[in-house]
């Protein structure tokens, strides 16, 4: 899109932990009064690629130019429970990993109330409370964004509780479906809580789901008792703070209580199922980072020390990683992407023809990218790996490992041939020929300098 020289140019930087997506960028810019037209899509996000005598070289970042808006996009790695996206003005410096001057912070998910009440709302709040704890003086606009998710006309009580806590903590809520941005606070007439008593009454009024251990709250004078299970109750996570939805909820209500009360409160956590040896190890935890200096006691346990808050919120991604390789391959290939899982970026379904989708189970093994070539009637499953982990990537492409996922693909595309390949990050693209005879072909290679090839 042409940039008019008569309009003053504006420059921004977006930092993201995920593959850059236009919907999140639009919502962040809209939050500060800058509108990106509906006609702008992910195709307008251009990889920063240069060419020399050696070949094409990716600079590890992207650019988006819309009218007078110039947006530079970079990947970052969080040092704690970091938000998914951050928007900064052009004067920001990133070498110290300080996010206090962010204009907007945004957490994104595709999970909705109908698919998972707790992970869609409560689990996400800890990202915001952690940021607020680290940067209490920040003026960043906080945005929770449900991207490409479907919400019913009537919310569950659990979702209403989570929405009201978000509103109490000044978190803006938006969803997007079929290109439309929806203000969730307005759609569902969400109101913030006005007192600690109101939070307690509302939470205790929610009926217990059969088979679940409900969270219950009570207050006696200046002490608030919170009965909440904080471990997963099995395996390596038994006795450890590991129940992410409940951790998010606990962080949310503690911070909401603190905001609404005039007099300092003491909080006693009961029925938590956390063992003393967990606290003795003083583990770094997003929970501790999100409730710094709040007076909290775990019944039956002694907390001798709390982990210190990290000095840095993030570091910029400076190396060519598996995630960068799969994101770049996804962007330079012209085929339709029907599934992507770039380094854990959330995508919970496979796209079929005519807007048909099939959900991928949370524990189902999955590849990094799946492409569709309608001309050849082919589906291409891609696994991204670092050079030293190629053998692992080959195993993960096996029919045995991907049995459930391939079954979903065959349901959606019974007439298509399924092929497999690797997307690798290697020391130098000059060495690519040594992988010509492995079980699955190398479809894309990115080296440590940023040079890439489509073999």
Locations of regions flagged by a protein language model:
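Catalytic cores of nucleic-acid endonucleases
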Residues: 111-158, 364-366, 372-445
């Amino acid at each position: 899109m042409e940039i008019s020289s008569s309009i003053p140019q504006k420059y921004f930087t977006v930092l993201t932990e995920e593959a850059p997506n236009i919907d999140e960028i639009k919502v962040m810019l809209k939050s500060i009064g800058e509108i990106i037209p509906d006609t702008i899509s992910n195709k307008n996000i251009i990889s920063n690629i240069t060419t020399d005598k050696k070949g094409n070289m990716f600079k590890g970042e992207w650019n988006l130019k819309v009218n007078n808006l110039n947006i530079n996009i970079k990947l970052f790695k969080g040092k704690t429970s970091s938000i998914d996206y951050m928007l900064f003005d052009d004067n920001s410096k990133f070498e110290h990993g300080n996010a206090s001057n962010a204009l907007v912070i945004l957490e994104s998910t595709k999970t909705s109330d109908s698919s998972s009440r707790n992970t869609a709302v409560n689990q996400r709040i800890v990202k915001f409370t952690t940021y607020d704890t680290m940067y209490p003086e920040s003026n960043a606009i906080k945005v929770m964004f449900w991207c490409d998710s479907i919400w019913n006309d009537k919310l569950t009580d659990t979702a209403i509780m989570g929405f009201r806590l978000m509103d109490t903590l000044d978190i803006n809520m938006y969803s997007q479906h079929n290109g439309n941005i929806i203000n969730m606070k307005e759609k569902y007439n969400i109101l913030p809580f006005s007192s600690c008593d109101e939070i307690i009454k509302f939470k205790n009024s929610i009926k217990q789901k059969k088979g679940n251990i409900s969270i219950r709250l009570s207050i006696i004078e200046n002490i608030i008792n919170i009965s909440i299970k904080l471990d997963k109750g099995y395996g390596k996570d038994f006795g450890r703070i590991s129940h992410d939805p409940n951790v998010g909820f606990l962080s949310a209500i503690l911070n909401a209580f603190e905001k609404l009360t005039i007099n300092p409160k003491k909080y006693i956590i009961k029925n938590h199922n956390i063992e003393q040896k967990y606290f003795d190890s003083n583990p770094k935890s997003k929970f501790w980072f999100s409730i710094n200096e709040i007076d909290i006691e775990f019944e039956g346990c002694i907390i001798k020390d709390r982990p210190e808050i990290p000095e840095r919120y993030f570091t910029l991604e400076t190396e060519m990683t598996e995630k960068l390789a799969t994101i770049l391959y996804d962007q330079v290939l012209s085929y339709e992407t029907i599934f992507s899982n770039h380094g854990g970026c959330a995508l919970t379904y496979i796209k079929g023809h005519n807007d048909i989708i099939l959900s991928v189970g949370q524990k189902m093994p999955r590849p990094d990218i799946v492409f569709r070539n309608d001309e050849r009637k082919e589906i291409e499953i891609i696994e991204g790996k670092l050079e030293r982990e190629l053998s692992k990537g080959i195993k993960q492409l096996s029919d045995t490992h991907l049995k459930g996922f391939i079954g979903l693909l065959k349901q959606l595309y019974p007439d298509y041939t399924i092929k497999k390949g690797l997307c690798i990050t290697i020391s130098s693209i000059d060495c690519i020929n040594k992988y010509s005879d492995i079980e699955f072909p190398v479809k894309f290679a990115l080296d440590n300098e940023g040079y890439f090839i489509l073999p």
